[in-house]
Curated annotation (Swiss-Prot):
The gene is FOXL2. This is Forkhead box protein L2. Keywords: Differentiation, DNA-binding, Isopeptide bond, Nucleus, Phosphoprotein, Transcription, Transcription regulation, Ubl conjugation. Transcriptional regulator. Critical factor essential for ovary differentiation and maintenance, and repression of the genetic program for somatic testis determination. Prevents trans-differentiation of ovary to testis through transcriptional repression of the Sertoli cell-promoting gene SOX9. Has apoptotic activity in ovarian cells. Suppresses ESR1-mediated transcription of PTGS2/COX2 stimulated by tamoxifen. Activates SIRT1 transcription under cellular stress conditions. Activates transcription of OSR2. Is a regulator of CYP19 expression. Is a transcriptional repressor of STAR. PROSITE patterns: FORK_HEAD_1, FORK_HEAD_2, FORK_HEAD_3. The modification Phosphoserine is found at S34. GO terms for molecular function: cysteine-type endopeptidase regulator activity involved in apoptotic process; DNA binding; DNA-binding transcription factor activity; DNA-binding transcription factor activity, RNA polymerase II-specific; RNA polymerase II cis-regulatory region sequence-specific DNA binding. The keyword Lipid biosynthesis does not apply. Residues 1-54, 277-338 are annotated as: Disordered.
């Protein structure tokens, strides 16, 4: 009995036959698609309609620009803008007063919108609104949700406030008030301080002013106290009025600072400076000064009695009835003068060295003696 074996080629063909059948069957059996899923995919590609209850995600500027661009003439009136917004977005059918007020504000305040008047006027009211040609591309690629930042055009400042001109005009004056040199350096922010003219100075302005030169204290006080001194002298040398007048003369002079060294002191009644002319006309001119320079004590004399000789080098302490610079307040009062005397005269041995009534007249005697004459009032 003989056994038969298949040849190698036949065996290889038999092994490959089932694999080729499998490859042919695989493309013939694709997985079927369910009808539910296919319908859902078609619905997702359809455009969505805006929800009337939801506010559109656009600003009022975008709504206005959208309405103007989609118009036939590229311009619309205010009522035309309202109608376009209501027709395109039903959300704005309610609460018209609120959003229409916002539309008007954006049209007036935004520089992208230009008002164009109607041609010829007529009975029709309202103006057209259009877009500024420089703001045509303010929305990137037609996307109204994103707005570009536009550079505002340069506008010159008003005429009353321009660089290079003075704050008070070219001449540095406005309304009668002038500042010297104000127009030469702009508004004077970095300029050195200016000084006002003397004609415009006022007491109410807190500007430091140089002090005026001090007049003579004796001449300044004599005119104010002449009447009071005459009345006190007529009443009598013992009256308290004369002492009050003489004491008041030293008060104003002491407040003038370094120009006066007069101190307030109580002088005896009836003692008045003979060079001021108070208490009657002087009986005699003052005696000439001595050639020596040491100080002397001042004497009090009655007007009717002849004046004694001045003390010399060998003079001792002053008598009890005299006043000395060392103790002006402790001096004893002089003897009472007759009632018919016009008043006591205050005589000094040397004029430049008055110790009790030391005023600025004697301080500046050497400097201003040529300009001011000694006149008795």
């Amino acid at each position: 009995m003989m056994a038969s074996y298949p040849e190698p080629e036949d065996a290889a063909g038999a092994l490959l036959a089932p694999e080729t059948g499998r490859t042919a069957k695989e493309p013939e059996a694709p997985p079927p698609l369910s009808p539910g899923k296919g319908g859902g995919g078609g619905a997702s590609t359809a455009p969505e309609k805006p929800d009337p209850a939801q506010k559109p995600p656009y600003s009022y500027v975008a709504l206005i620009a959208m309405a103007i661009r989609e118009s036939a003439e590229k311009r619309l009136t205010l009522s035309g803008i309202y109608q376009y917004i209501i027709a395109k977005f039903p959300f704005y059918e309610k609460n018209k007063k609120g959003w229409q007020n916002s539309i008007r504000h954006n049209l007036s305040l935004n520089e992208c919108f230009i008002k164009v008047p109607r041609e010829g006027g007529g009975e029709r009211k309202g103006n057209y609104w259009t877009l500024d040609p420089a703001c045509e591309d303010m929305f990137e690629k037609g996307n109204y949700r994103r707005r570009r930042r536009m550079k505002r055009p340069f506008r010159p400042p008003p005429a009353h406030f321009q660089p290079g001109k003075g704050l008070f005009g070219a001449g540095g004056a406005a309304g009668g008030c002038g500042v010297a040199g104000a127009g030469a350096d702009g508004y004077g922010y970095l300029a050195p301080p200016k000084y006002l003219q003397s004609g415009f100075l006022n007491n109410s302005w807190p500007l430091p002013q140089p002090p005026s030169p001090m007049p003579y204290a004796s001449c300044q006080m004599a005119a104010a106290a002449a009447a009071a001194a005459a009345a006190a002298a007529a009443a009598g040398p013992g009256s308290p009025g004369a002492a009050a007048v003489v004491k008041g003369l030293a008060g104003p002079a002491a407040s003038y600072g370094p120009y006066s060294r007069v101190q307030s002191m109580a002088l005896p009644p009836g003692v008045v400076n003979s060079y001021n002319g108070l208490g009657g006309p002087p009986a005699a001119p003052p005696p000439p000064p001595h050639p020596h320079s040491h100080p002397h004590a001042h004497h009090l004399h009655a007007a009717a009695a002849p004046p004694p000789a001045p003390p010399h080098h060998g003079a001792a302490a002053p008598p009890p009835g005299q006043l000395s610079p060392a103790s002006p307040a402790t001096a004893a009062p002089p003897a009472p003068a007759p009632t018919n005397a016009p008043g006591l005269q205050f005589a000094c041995a040397r004029q430049p060295e008055l110790a009790m009534m030391h005023c600025s007249y004697w301080d500046h005697d050497s400097k201003t003696g040529a300009l001011h004459s000694r006149l008795d009032l």
